[in-house]
């Protein structure tokens, strides 16, 4: 047997080059204008009509099929049990490294899915709000590991997702400020009976330790109905992080309230050296130790090239 065919046979994913994936859009309509797409794009991402048409519309079509199937299964189970539970939200996880473009992908999906017919209520929550406050991280010696699994208030995040799946409302999530690099005290967003909830974060596919006493320990992805992993090679991610750091030095870091205001006056060479040091110390370590090992747990992997566009798509076999 051909070794490549054998490898493909046992590969848990079907891998599509960009051109093949784009054909799966079929007649899924484009519901976003160019100016709306531009507003969804993060500062260093490349997102345009072509990227939405060729990558995200096929994904939107796929998700519409998955959501409809889940709704039919829910109705069948309800009839079987003879109960009248409220329909639970369909939860989509979006994972991947710092600087890979998770926020852009999550916002694009929210915008596209919210324009399905009939118009579903689609909410987006990032796990940044579930980071422990800086004061707690400082006390525990975890500031250099912010974004690592141990830096999150996992019980609060699991409680939030459990309440969402249980149909409770409203459910509150803390607010995080990228300006102050900290949780905003006494500030919350409320999520109330969404049809679809998108949860975006670097470690949302993280697994927990195996139980020693036989009792199951829930993890965030236990609550997901579908998950997307944004992927790129590590040197590419580092370059994107450095580019973003330079852009922030000239914008957000200039604000005196910014946690990173001390970097605002760095020269280009100093800023690049600082960004690379942060990447190597924190973000690369988190990627290699915690984030990348969760990639095989995703239902769908979007692999990006150095130009920020998706080159191929891997869909987990059923």
Curated annotation (Swiss-Prot):
Pathway: Cofactor biosynthesis; coenzyme A biosynthesis; CoA from (R)-pantothenate: step 1/5. Pfam families: PRK. ATP binds at residues 96-103. It catalyses: (R)-pantothenate + ATP = (R)-4'-phosphopantothenate + ADP + H(+). It is found in: Cytoplasm. SUPFAM superfamilies: P-loop containing nucleoside triphosphate hydrolases. GO terms for molecular function: ATP binding; pantothenate kinase activity. The keyword Zinc does not apply. CDD domains: PanK. One of its GO terms (cellular component) is cytoplasm. Keywords: ATP-binding, Coenzyme A biosynthesis, Cytoplasm, Kinase, Nucleotide-binding, Transferase. Its EC number is 2.7.1.33. The keyword Transferase applies. Gene3D superfamilies: P-loop containing nucleotide triphosphate hydrolases (3.40.50.300). NCBIfam families: panK_bact. Belongs to the prokaryotic pantothenate kinase family. This is Pantothenate kinase.
